[in-house]
Amino acid sequence: LLAGGVLGANRGAMSMGLYVALGAIGLPFYAEGTGGWTAATGATAGYLVGFIVAAFVVGKMAEHGQDRKLSTSIPAFLAGTLIIYGIGAGWLAYDLGLPLTGAAGEPSAISLGVAPFLVGDVLKALLAGAMLPAAWRFIEDGR
């Protein structure tokens, strides 16, 4: 998400595409130091695609000035997080043959691929959304 906010839509998406491609050819860039074609096309492939799409969307928002103020930057990063979760959980459900949602205690894509990470990811989105406007102010003041 930060790549999109800093680099803009096209460069942000390309940087995430490069990340996915380098991981797919075997570099240990993915979670827990994994990489390779199996990791890139497995159950978590949707999250990798989501990174690319989210970087593009957050980048577009940044190109329209939504990275300059706290009141617009944080929602942009939260939207990016939702995009990653939407694409990722959708693919996870498909790949594992799980329902997207389920009854409490029943396995679902949301319970396995969103719930365990939600608090940490929201905190990271809030932190990035708060830091980016401050960083731009620092950079612009230094000119």
Question: What residue spans do the PLM features occupy?
Answer:
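Alpha-helical membrane segments and adjacent membrane-interface helices in multi-pass membrane proteins
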Residues: 1-57
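Transmembrane alpha-helix boundary and packing residues in multipass membrane permease domains
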Residues: 19-20, 55, 59, 89, ...
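Short helix-perturbing small/polar motifs within transmembrane alpha-helices
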Residues: 37-86
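Membrane-embedded alpha-helical hairpins and interfacial helices in multi-pass inner-membrane proteins
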Residues: 65-142
